[in-house]
Amino acid sequence: MSERKVMTVLNGKTVTPPPIWLMRQAGRYLPEYRETRKSAGSFLDLCYNPELASEVTLQPIRRFGLDAAILFSDILVIPDALHRNVSFSEGKGPAMDPIDISGIEKLDASDVMAHLSPVFETVSRLRTSLPDETTLLGFCGAPWTVATYMIAGHGTPDQAPARLFGYQEPAAMEKLLALLAEVSADYLVAQIDAGADAVQIFDSWAGVLGEKEFEEYAIKPVARIIASVRARRPSAKIIAFAKGAGYLLRDYRRKTGANAIGLDWSVPLSFARDLQKEGPVQGNLDPMLMVAGGKALQDGIDAVLQSLGQGPLIFNLGHGITPQADPENVTRLVQRVRSVGGAG
């Protein structure tokens, strides 16, 4: 079997040039995705259709030859499986029934895995469809980020509703995060059992938290997920991405036990290099460079490679690729990383 380069890095080794994949690499910037999406019905229908979900997962692999495929799904399938009436509307994003204390008391996780069984079928299909050398990544949302949507009922600019709820109802918040951690760990184990080589935990809203809350809401629940997964699957490889965490990332790595940490584009490369001394890092090109292209893109790629290319690095963006990105810029990115990534 060919070597899966992402897995080599997750084992703490340096690969030259570094492997590359992109968060949200299957998405609206690709014309083939938009075509498939049209035939799926709703966005959640696409997530729960193994044939179409595996097709859109494979599209960027076919087009760009990336080193990893990431399961096409959404972090909000967990609240959907908890019967929170999740929906997605064009231009408005996700919505669901906002949860309160009594709703948290009534949450029933008994049929979550059955509800998510199409996702596991998608993972199984992908493992048989992907080239041998391509790493298959599963994922889930971190409890804090998922909770922000559950509490507000939709996305908000600074997650004020969830932050306020945490201050006013700390016991209920703790209960919600604990349940989400438990369900998420089961979900990741099932993805690994279905064929995922490694998994990523996305904490997209970690950056709105103060230091104390970051410890309680970002670090502890993710550490709980990782410990639970490892108790059952000791060799599991896990990437944890806490967007906006800044200098708290050092604590985050040490306390969660993640094999690699994802870095957003605001993390200074000098600090990223320090973090890399403790283990693999993933990131951290600004997604806007995939829209801008040109010299700005080339300089951005080279800066990341120059700073981080001599250690264990999975090259990625600092957050998801945007719908405005030019697919040609992804081609240029992959070519540049593979030609320059071995130099220096």
Swiss-Prot record:
Q: Where does substrate bind?
A: R24, Q25, A26, G27, R28, F43, D74, Y149, S204, H319
Concerning InterPro entries, the annotation shows: UROD/MetE-like_sf, Uroporphyrinogen_deCO2ase_HemE, Uroporphyrinogen_deCOase
Among the GO biological process terms of this entry, one is: protoporphyrinogen IX biosynthetic process from glutamate
User: Quaternary structure?
Assistant: Homodimer.
As recorded in Swiss-Prot or TrEMBL, the protein's gene is named hemE
- The protein, known as: Uroporphyrinogen decarboxylase
Q: Which Gene3D superfamilies match?
A: 3.20.20.210
- Catalyses which reaction(s): uroporphyrinogen III + 4 H(+) = coproporphyrinogen III + 4 CO2
NCBIfam families cross-referenced by the UniProt entry: hemE
- The protein's organism comes out as Agrobacterium fabrum (strain C58 / ATCC 33970) (Agrobacterium tumefaciens (strain C58))
Query: Does the record's keyword annotation contain Lyase?
Result: yes
In this chain, the site described as Transition state stabilizer is at D74
Quote the SUPFAM superfamilies the UniProt record gives. Answer: UROD/MetE-like
